[in-house]
């Protein structure tokens, strides 16, 4: 391995919008990151069905096309 050509690989603390925090590693310049979903609150991992609406997209779709009646 050549010296001096590889990026600095350091720990970064990640905070989710649900309040969960964990530490991972990054080659980026930041020391702290914020994410919208993590394994503690993502529907795939929790088994709970919920809609993750980013930027009102679901509401805009329902307004435009309406909800499907059963």
From Swiss-Prot:
Signal peptide: none annotated. Binds the 23S rRNA. Binds 1 zinc ion per subunit. Part of the 50S ribosomal subunit. It comes from Bifidobacterium longum (strain NCC 2705). One of its GO terms (biological process) is translation. Keywords: Metal-binding, Ribonucleoprotein, Ribosomal protein, RNA-binding, rRNA-binding, Zinc. It comes from the Bacteria. Zn(2+) binds at residues 16, 18, 38, 41. PROSITE patterns: RIBOSOMAL_L31. NCBIfam families: L31 (TIGR00105), PRK00019.1 (NF000612), PRK00528.1 (NF001809). Gene3D superfamilies: Ribosomal protein L31. Belongs to the bacterial ribosomal protein bL31 family. Type A subfamily. Its cofactor is Zn(2+). GO terms for cellular component: ribonucleoprotein complex; ribosome. GO terms for molecular function: metal ion binding; rRNA binding; structural constituent of ribosome. This is Large ribosomal subunit protein bL31. The keyword Protein transport does not apply.
């Amino acid at each position: 391995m050549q010296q001096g050509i590889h990026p600095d690989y350091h720990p970064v603390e990640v905070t989710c919008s649900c309040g969960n925090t964990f530490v991972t590693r990054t080659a980026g310049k930041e020391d702290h990151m914020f994410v919208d979903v993590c394994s503690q609150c993502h529907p795939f991992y929790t088994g709970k069905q919920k809609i993750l609406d980013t930027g009102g997209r679901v509401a805009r779709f329902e307004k435009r096309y309406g909800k499907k009646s059963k």
